[in-house]
Swiss-Prot record:
Residues 2-430 form the BRO1 domain. It comes from Cryptococcus neoformans var. neoformans serotype D (strain B-3501A). This is pH-response regulator protein palC. Belongs to the palC family. Residues 449-488 are annotated as: Disordered. The lineage of its organism: Eukaryota, Fungi, Dikarya, Basidiomycota, Agaricomycotina. It holds the Pfam family BRO1.
């Protein structure tokens, strides 16, 4: 169930006074504070990796909020030559989106800009994981598949669920905006470093996290997850009807528009598919590819084919590849379901054949996702996760497919009966039908970085010459900025 739960990066400890030279001795205290703030981030990430009590994505977000202004100040002072590296700098990080055959190593990444990139990546992933934790804490409100107990919700649960869904959507939009900003800003500063020997993965290859395409894809994935969460919120008011009424026609009067839902799911499918295409850019060069089979995920294929991801050293982790493949397929199936319902319910009896074509196609796609052979192939691909967690995720994904398949079968049965007894219309092939374009309901939330905690002293001197009140040497004023305090 979206959003995807990411493994967060981890890093080693750094003492800035040990790697930076401060010729003017103006930044001794500030560098000590920067080291303390980075240590807090290190401990927050380590706590999650070690499953320590109290560790959470919220603690990581708090640590990033404190450290990022210090990091920006250090970068500004390095650019102004007021701070200098004592030697060749390396910042060790574990890359959570890059697959490794064995345990993920600490990669020595060159340049302070690599450090900046990994911190911003941590911020985006932690925002998504925080949204995931909010949704996981909500009462169960979707109908379970099969003859199981129906969820029961009090009015207090309904308020809490509505607020939780809205908050999760906002967090995911923030995360999407952070990833988009990183792709257009920080990644461009890391690109020239790709020829540097340190930080490489294999033969001249950096981790997937260093790629601009990866951040663009990540922004799309997070935005798609936000839309799916928004759709859940959109359908929440009709929960009572869906709990007690059998699936199939007619829709209740207060049900969200069928064409709107179809266009939303088409947009989600477009985002996931575009993300898959962008992630293929970071795959191994042909000369170093282990085999042609490792490229199957991104080869051209029919929409109904779900190509299984393979675990290839240095490429995107197979769990994320599989997530994109399945969510793209599921979104397209649900889009076709709602296109069929729109044709059947709003066509005044003139489009029963078209409605039947759409819902039958949706049924076929959902059955492909439910195929037991395909699930057996996927079983061993969740590397790095506990067995129980893999079972829970598979069970949750399976429940969604089963639930939707039951609903679609009811619509197919209803439209088939209507066509056989009343309409007598031919059922056209889906390829002959016009698919509308997808429709977004929001975009990424623009990310404006917080101001630096301190700045080069010569900027302060310039302010004095211009007659402005300048802050204390090496520090900046605590000005307001868009999104201030809205880190989590």
């Amino acid at each position: 169930m979206p959003p995807y739960l990411y493994r967060l990066p981890t890093t080693s400890l750094i003492t800035f006074s040990a790697i930076l030279n401060d010729p003017s001795s103006s930044y001794t205290t500030i560098l000590s504070d920067a080291t303390a703030s980075r240590t807090k981030l290190h401990l927050a990430l380590k706590g999650i990796a070690d499953n320590e009590p109290g560790a959470s994505a919220l603690a990581v977000l708090d640590a990033v909020q404190i450290y990022l202004p210090y990091l920006k100040g250090i970068i500004a002072c390095l650019d102004a030559d007021e701070l200098l590296f004592k030697g060749e700098p390396t910042f060790q990080w574990r890359a959570p989106l890059t697959h490794f055959s064995f345990s993920s190593p600490l990669l020595p990444l060159a340049s302070i800009h690599s450090e900046h990139l990994m911190v911003v990546l941590t911020y985006a992933l932690a925002l998504s994981n925080y949204a995931h934790s909010i949704l996981a804490s909500l009462p169960a409100f979707e109908i379970p598949a099969g003859p199981k107990a129906m969820p029961h919700m009090s009015s207090e649960d309904e308020k809490r669920t509505t607020a939780g869904l809205a908050r999760a959507v906002d967090l995911l939009c923030q995360a999407s905006g952070v990833a988009e900003w990183a792709a257009e800003n920080v990644c461009l500063q890391v690109e020239p470093l790709k020829g540097v020997s340190s930080g490489r993965l294999g033969k001249g290859k950096w981790p997937a996290e260093s790629s601009r395409e990866t951040f663009k894809a990540l922004s799309m994935i997070l935005l798609a997850d936000a839309h799916l969460t928004a759709i859940r919120k959109l359908l929440f008011p009709v929960l009572t009807y869906t709990l007690f009424a059998p699936p199939g026609p007619p829709l209740p009067p207060n049900h969200p528009s069928a064409p709107l839902q179809a266009k939303l799911y088409l947009y989600v499918h477009q985002l996931y598919s575009s993300a898959r295409a962008l992630l293929s850019v970071h795959q191994q060069p042909t000369s170093s590819a282990p085999s042609n089979s490792s490229r199957k995920l991104f080869r051209s294929n029919t929409d109904k084919d779900v190509i299984e991801p393979e675990a290839v050293e240095g490429e995107i982790i197979p769990e994320l590849k599989r997530y994109l493949a399945k969510e793209a397929q599921l979104a397209l199936a649900l889009a076709h379901k709602w296109l069929g319902i729109d044709a059947g319910e709003n066509g005044k009896g003139a489009k029963v054949g078209e409605a039947l074509a759409w819902v039958k196609d949706a049924q076929g796609r959902l059955e492909d996702l439910e195929d037991s052979k395909m699930r057996a192939k996927l079983k061993g691909l969740s590397i790095g996760k506990s067995r129980e967690r893999k079972k829970e995720e598979r069970r949750a994904r399976m429940g969604r497919v089963e639930r939707e398949l039951e609903v679609v079968k009811a619509w197919v049965k209803a439209y088939q009966k209507m066509n056989d007894t009343v309409a007598f219309q031919p059922v056209p092939p889906v390829s002959s039908l016009v698919t509308p374009s997808g429709r977004p309901i929001f975009g990424p939330k623009a990310f404006i970085p917080p101001p630096s905690k301190f700045s080069p002293s010569r900027i302060g001197h310039l302010n004095e010459e211009q007659g402005n009140d300048s802050p204390e040497l090496g520090e900046t004023e605590d000005t307001s900025y868009a999104g201030k305090g809205n880190y989590f």
